[in-house]
C-alpha cells in the first residue's frame, strides 16, 4: 500500500533499508567468531564494547567525560580494553576528535557489540551515562577527578587568538550562556 502511494521513491527507500539490514546482519555474523575468540581471551585480555549517543552535543560531551572520570575513580576498570561506536548523527565533529584522543571509537565496533549479545555468557556491555544516570553526575565524579577532554597547546593558542580578535584578552573573565530554541531539535 505504501509503495502504491509513494511510488518508486518509496520502493527505493524500502529496498535501501532492507539491503542495509541484510548487510548489518552479515557483519554481525562475521563478528561472532571474533567475539568468541575475545571471550576465550577475556581472562588475560578483557574487552568490553559500548556506545555513546552522539546526536546531542551535551549528552555526548557529558557521557564521554563521565565515562573517563569513572575510569579514573575505578582503578579495576584499567584492566579492560574498551571499544566504542556512536549512535546517531554526530552533533559536533570536533568533540568527536577530542573523544577519539582518549577512547577507541569506530563504527565497526557496533557489529562486535551486537554479536556479543548473541553469544551466550556475554561480557557486560558498557551502557552510556545517558541511560544510567540521565546524563547527570550523581556520584560527584566531575568534582573529584581531572578534566579528560583537553585542548592541545596549539588549540589553546588558536582559541586565545579568536577571543583577542573579538576584543577579549586572555586575562579577562567570560560568561557563557548555553541557550537554544526547541526548534534546534527539528533542524538539520
Labelled PLM ranges:
Residues 1-188:
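N-terminal targeting/anchoring "stem" of glycan-biosynthesis enzymes
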